[in-house]
Amino acid sequence: MKIINGSMAAMLASATICGPAFAQDATTAAADPMDRGVFAGDWFMVGIGAGVRPSYEGSDDYVLFPAPLAQGSIGGIDFGARGAGLYADLIADSDSASAVKFVAGPLFRVRPDRNGNIKDPVVRLLGKEDVAIEVGATLGVSFAKLINPFDNLALSTDIQWDVAGAHKGRLISPSVSYSTPLSTAIFTSLSLSATHVDGNYADTYFSIDSVGSAASGLPQFDADGGWKSYGASLLGGVDLSGDARDGGWGVFGLVIYSRLTGDAKRSPVTSLRGDADQWFLAGGISYTF
C-alpha cells in the first residue's frame, strides 16, 4: 500500500490558506479569504518526527522509524516526500482559483523491505533482500469546492518500477483522498488506496523456494502478482500560531491501516509468521517558511 498518496504539505496548504471560512475568531473570519500568506509564492516545509511500522511487509512485529518531512513549491512546481522517496508535480498551478487541477510528474522511492531489522527469527532465516530503488510517475486530478469553498477531492495513480534489480517488479497504486480545513490552524485528510503488483514483486517478498523452506522450516510457496493490499489513512495537522498562512511551527499526526490480500496474505511470512493487518503510526513537528 502506498503510505501517503499526495503531499502532506499540499494538503496543509490547500486546507489552511482558505481557513477564514472556518475560523471561529471574528477577526480572522473577516480576513481576505484569498490571502494565501506564505503560500502565495515559493514556500518550503521541513520537519522531523518518528513512528512505528511492521518490521517487514506482513509482519506482526513493529519497529521504530524516523519520519523526516520535506515539501515545497518553486515557481508553481510542487515537490515533496512520497513514502520513502520524492515526487514532483511538473504542471505549474498558473490559476490558483481554478476548481480543477491536474497533477503529473516523476517519482522515486527507496524500498528497504526485508533488508534488515527483521524481528521474526524464522523469517530472518529466509535471508535479506536487496534494497529496491523504484522510479515512475504520478498522475492525477483534483476537484475543489465540493462541500465547502475550501475542501479538495483528489484522484491519482502512482506507477513505479524497480531499477536496482532487487525485485525487478512493478507497482500500480490508485487512490482517492479528501482534505478540508477545520479552522485556520487545523486541517485533516482521509485517503483510500490500493496497490497492485506484478509477479516479480510478489515472488521476491512473498514466495518461499526450496532453499528458504529448508532454512526456515516454512512451507514452500509460489506467490503470484495481483492486488497486494488496500487501506486507509487519516492525516491531521495543527499550526501552533493559530494561522497556517503565516508559516512557522506546526505539528502533524498520521495513522495508516493496510490490509494485505491475495498471495501477500496467503504467504507463510504473513499467514504463519505475521498478520495481514498492517498499521503505521507517525507524528512530528514541522516548520514552514
Regions found by a protein language model. Name each.
Residues D42, Y62-P68, V100, E129-V135, ...:
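Residues that define the transmembrane beta-barrel architecture of outer-membrane proteins
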Residues I48-V52, P68-I74, L86-A92, P106, ...:
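Residues on the lipid-exposed face of transmembrane beta-strands in outer-membrane beta-barrel proteins
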